């Protein structure tokens, strides 16, 4: 009929709407997936940590909670800053002093709490506490802030508690 326009035909590609729905679902699942995907396998398996755990904060018995993600961050920091001298919790420059829980407790002052490990990392002292330790470099806040250093300390302490062979100086199965 004259004067009337017919609506333009719209072409639809079959399944196009479903494709977009599928893509959006995948994106949503990626963003909403549990944090377990960000947990290092070493942390979940050897540190036996898939849920938040409590570690000793200070010698008075106060505890601090750490998530598996924080322990993963601590592990990554350990690998980038400490691994050259502390493979598997051993201490290559001083093999008789490891990062085992026994050796951490035996230091003066003891280094078996998060607070003590952070203090040590800021100002390394000899095992008996009498002099500056030149074997371990100080970690200034400009390098690692307090939260990062607590995560590193938490990784070391948790590994000393439960990781098989940690601090045993049995590198390479020897």
From Swiss-Prot:
One Gene Ontology term of the molecular function aspect = heme binding
The residues forming the signal peptide are 1-37
List, in alphabetical order, the GO biological process terms annotated in this UniProt record.
photosynthesis
Stored Pfam families: Cytochrom_C550 (PF14495)
- InterPro entries xref list: Cyt_c-like_dom (IPR009056), Cyt_c-like_dom_sf (IPR036909), Cytochrom_C550 (IPR029490)
Q: Which UniProt keywords apply?
A: Electron transport, Heme, Iron, Membrane, Metal-binding, Photosynthesis, Photosystem II, Signal, Thylakoid, Transport
**Known cofactor(s):** heme c
A GO cellular component annotation here is: photosystem II
Q: Does the keyword Zinc apply?
A: no
What function does the entry list? Possible low-potential cytochrome c.
Q: Which family does it belong to?
A: Belongs to the cytochrome c family. PsbV subfamily.
Q: What is this protein called?
A: Cytochrome c-550-like protein
Q: Which organism is it from?
A: Synechococcus sp. (strain JA-3-3Ab) (Cyanobacteria bacterium Yellowstone A-Prime)
